[in-house]
Amino acid sequence: MDGRVQLMKALLAGPLRPAARRWRNPIPFPETFDGDTDRLPEFIVQTSSYMFVDENTFSNDALKVTFLITRLTGPALQWVIPYIRKESPLLNDYRGFLAEMKRVFGWEEDEDF
């Protein structure tokens, strides 16, 4: 457990934290995702919408992936830990990370989503 906590603290210590400001994201803060395939589309829509309206904070793929990781729990969080430990290139590739999540959690979709 200590290792997981340290990993998450290291992720959160980065530039993801926005400077204090008055503007507030109008999109509700995304719920967590635990690996339930049926909830994956909803999770992706929630997180994508939240990041879309705040492009200043989520200005690159690494920040977007880091935000997704902060919303993972249970089996989904366990799944991502090896990627963090190995410093996988997927951590800097938002589309690639989403594609891997979809593959791992069994979500089949149309190419356009």
UniProtKB/Swiss-Prot annotation:
<dbReference type="Pfam" id="PF16297">
    <property type="entry name" value="DUF4939"/>
</dbReference>
<comment type="similarity">
    <text>Belongs to the FAM127 family.</text>
</comment>
<dbReference type="InterPro" id="IPR032549">
    <property type="entry name" value="DUF4939"/>
</dbReference>
<protein>
    <recommendedName>
        <fullName>Retrotransposon Gag-like protein 8A</fullName>
    </recommendedName>
</protein>
